[in-house]
Amino acid sequence: MHINYYTKHIDLEEEISQEMEKKMAKFEKFADEATLIDLTVEGDLPKKSVKVSLHYNDATHSFYACEEAKDVMTAFNTAKEELFTEITRVIGKERDQSRSKARQAKETIRQTS
Protein backbone atom coordinates (compact mmCIF):
# COMPACT_ATOMS: atom_id res chain seq x y z
CA MET A 1 0.00 0.00 0.00
CA HIS A 2 1.35 3.41 -1.00
CA ILE A 3 0.74 6.38 1.31
CA ASN A 4 1.13 9.80 -0.26
CA TYR A 5 2.77 11.95 2.41
CA TYR A 6 3.19 14.81 -0.03
CA THR A 7 -0.48 15.82 0.15
CA LYS A 8 -0.21 16.12 3.92
CA HIS A 9 2.68 18.57 3.63
CA ILE A 10 1.32 20.63 0.77
CA ASP A 11 -0.10 23.31 3.09
CA LEU A 12 3.16 23.77 4.99
CA GLU A 13 3.94 27.05 3.22
CA GLU A 14 0.46 28.35 4.06
CA GLU A 15 0.99 27.41 7.72
CA ILE A 16 4.30 29.27 7.71
CA SER A 17 2.64 32.35 6.20
CA GLN A 18 -0.04 32.28 8.89
CA GLU A 19 2.61 31.95 11.60
CA MET A 20 4.48 34.97 10.24
CA GLU A 21 1.25 36.98 10.14
CA LYS A 22 0.76 36.18 13.83
CA LYS A 23 4.29 37.42 14.54
CA MET A 24 3.61 40.61 12.60
CA ALA A 25 0.41 41.22 14.60
CA LYS A 26 2.40 40.81 17.81
CA PHE A 27 4.97 43.36 16.69
CA GLU A 28 2.29 45.77 15.48
CA LYS A 29 1.00 45.62 19.04
CA PHE A 30 4.56 46.28 20.20
CA ALA A 31 4.70 49.45 18.12
CA ASP A 32 1.93 50.82 20.32
CA GLU A 33 3.24 49.44 23.62
CA ALA A 34 7.02 49.95 23.50
CA THR A 35 8.19 51.70 26.63
CA LEU A 36 10.52 54.67 26.49
CA ILE A 37 13.14 53.88 29.13
CA ASP A 38 15.86 56.35 28.23
CA LEU A 39 16.02 59.48 26.15
CA THR A 40 19.27 61.43 25.97
CA VAL A 41 19.58 64.71 24.11
CA GLU A 42 23.10 65.68 23.05
CA GLY A 43 24.45 68.58 21.00
CA ASP A 44 23.56 72.18 20.34
CA LEU A 45 20.51 73.96 19.00
CA PRO A 46 18.91 74.04 16.49
CA LYS A 47 19.55 70.32 15.93
CA LYS A 48 20.25 67.69 18.53
CA SER A 49 21.23 64.06 18.35
CA VAL A 50 18.57 62.19 20.26
CA LYS A 51 19.29 58.75 21.68
CA VAL A 52 16.10 56.80 22.20
CA SER A 53 16.06 53.47 24.02
CA LEU A 54 13.03 51.24 23.76
CA HIS A 55 12.37 48.27 26.01
CA TYR A 56 10.21 45.33 24.98
CA ASN A 57 10.17 41.63 25.87
CA ASP A 58 13.30 41.82 28.03
CA ALA A 59 15.29 43.47 25.24
CA THR A 60 16.50 47.03 24.89
CA HIS A 61 16.89 48.69 21.50
CA SER A 62 18.65 52.05 21.12
CA PHE A 63 18.56 54.40 18.16
CA TYR A 64 20.05 57.77 17.38
CA ALA A 65 17.94 60.22 15.46
CA CYS A 66 18.89 63.75 14.47
CA GLU A 67 15.74 65.78 14.99
CA GLU A 68 14.76 69.40 15.25
CA ALA A 69 15.05 70.38 18.91
CA LYS A 70 11.41 71.47 19.03
CA ASP A 71 10.00 67.92 19.03
CA VAL A 72 11.88 65.22 20.91
CA MET A 73 8.85 62.90 20.75
CA THR A 74 9.32 62.82 16.98
CA ALA A 75 12.64 61.08 17.63
CA PHE A 76 10.92 58.56 19.88
CA ASN A 77 8.28 57.82 17.25
CA THR A 78 10.96 57.62 14.55
CA ALA A 79 12.91 55.12 16.65
CA LYS A 80 9.80 52.97 17.10
CA GLU A 81 9.21 53.03 13.34
CA GLU A 82 12.85 52.11 12.65
CA LEU A 83 12.68 49.25 15.13
CA PHE A 84 9.43 48.01 13.60
CA THR A 85 11.03 48.17 10.14
CA GLU A 86 14.00 46.14 11.38
CA ILE A 87 11.76 43.57 13.04
CA THR A 88 9.71 43.31 9.85
CA ARG A 89 12.92 42.69 7.86
CA VAL A 90 14.05 39.96 10.26
CA ILE A 91 10.62 38.29 10.22
CA GLY A 92 10.60 38.42 6.41
CA LYS A 93 14.01 36.73 6.36
CA GLU A 94 12.76 34.05 8.79
CA ARG A 95 9.69 33.51 6.61
CA ASP A 96 11.81 33.11 3.47
CA GLN A 97 14.11 30.62 5.23
CA SER A 98 11.12 28.65 6.54
CA ARG A 99 9.53 28.54 3.09
CA SER A 100 12.79 27.34 1.61
CA LYS A 101 12.94 24.54 4.21
CA ALA A 102 9.32 23.66 3.43
CA ARG A 103 10.11 23.41 -0.29
CA GLN A 104 13.12 21.20 0.47
CA ALA A 105 11.00 18.98 2.71
CA LYS A 106 8.36 18.64 0.01
CA GLU A 107 11.01 17.76 -2.56
CA THR A 108 12.55 15.16 -0.23
CA ILE A 109 9.13 13.63 0.43
CA ARG A 110 8.34 13.62 -3.28
CA GLN A 111 11.66 11.88 -4.08
CA THR A 112 11.23 9.23 -1.39
CA SER A 113 7.59 8.47 -2.26
Kindly label every feature range from the protein language model.
Residues 1-113:
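N-terminal, polar/charged subdomain of small-to-medium soluble alpha/beta proteins
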